[in-house]
């Protein structure tokens, strides 16, 4: 089983960051990993028990993960686990923890865990997939940070006048 953790400081309060991350209508405004993201099974907003489908960019295999929110506690914590069985993933789960750190900033910690398939190739696939997923997650969180840096009124952001 592979594990990883990536942390980024965002120039916004945890409530704002949490809301943007789980707004599927706006997800592709900042998420560099995905080519599509939507709530599924009639869900109209992220919540405990809601399902979502996120499909990676083609250069990463274009794999679609269908997940269910197992925890949804705004603005602190959200966690999902994989429901489908796409190529190369036997299991997959992730959490996003948000913490206000003062001066209008927050810390986002993304933790993931997965098993690769086929089982006979886990010893090769998990280290490789883990490195790629950690790098892509770091890239995603940096893009999220830049998204908040560009908003009016942010330090280094667009001026309001």
Q: Where are the regions a protein language model picked out?
A:
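Generic structural detector for well-ordered beta-strands
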Residues: 7-11, 38, 68, 81, ...
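Glycine-rich portal/gate segments that line the openings of hydrophobic small-molecule binding cavities
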Residues: 38-87, 103-107, 139-161
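Short, intrinsically disordered, mixed-charge
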Residues: 19-26, 130, 146-150
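Short, surface-exposed coil-to-beta transition loops
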Residues: 3-5, 62-67, 89-94
